């Protein structure tokens, strides 16, 4: 900290020509803060200076505070030192302004027309079945062809683009390479060949999630850094998203990024046969820990389209710094048409698909997400055999329901003299004691996030544990999230409530061949 030596070294470095020069400086951590800080390894543990430390700093810097004033931890006000402020500003002007400085240019794109998202509004036709991953790829193509955002859509894939069914985009939009195609790909004779181009729009990053996430950050912050807004979609094997690069996603949030993270091949049982390394049932839970991320688990194509439409509107029209994480799956099933007036419920996180049929007999409420919704629909039919009627609900985001719950709780806590507000969950479900079964292809902790705002008799089924290599049917039976498990959970609640006799449950368990024993070699 010898300023004469410091300036002499810098002057020599500037004067040296012909090769790079490094000035190596040995400094003392906490220098200038007094003997209690300087050179002590406790600097980060010191959160507050005592009076003797303040006196040292005052005397060392020539400040005019009295000992009595120091007891109140006074600030040095800029107005009291105009000559120093003027000097500091002049130095910053020489360095092209203050750093860091965030410039927020006007958004230079518009939102696509509603028809861009409408392909699946009428559902699938005939015997056609699609997965939500397939629906996403078709929606992505529609966005890339739209006049509003087409050239600004940035698809980023670190691996498995063909697994996700994205190979049709290779020839149509090209894979970006700064020098174009430098080799003949092994699939050059097929229609959907691997096509690299200087003008390509897709980013294929190889098996490099850190690099792909960095590309996502660059694209997701380009509206601020370059005044050119893009709409990035980072598509990855869901297990290798938050589990592998959560710190980079936190960094993206810190940089106020905007874009979509698509956790493809999601689900502990839906991605079957790939064991504990790949079968993901916890990324949604991890996504909910990031304050800048909205996390979604759509069951149907129209839900997916509604969520993406809402996300683009948030980023472009509402000018929000937000990241949307969407779980999509590889299980094919018929997609129903979009019901009327469900957009609000989809975005809030919960809506009714169908009420209980008229008639006699007890009623249960079944809540599904993702492709496990098909197991819910299977349970509806099984329950009818035992005289039980079912309401069917779709939970698109337990995270959004929880955000709403916490916000309402805070308002009620701070306004005890006013009529208490209700959460969206409470508004939808009321205070009925009707048994509720919520089932997910993720850990039970995901639907459990909203237990506080649920009515009584709320039961959750999830896929806690390691993934296992087997068929979907076997996995769902093992994790107890199949139609049979949902049926038995509903009957069990009805027995507890006194609506049916225990013999009805026993009859169902016998019919489905259920054993209460479970062999899990991974249990601790």
Regions found by a protein language model. Name each.
Residues 1-336, 343-344, 399, ...:
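Thiamine diphosphate
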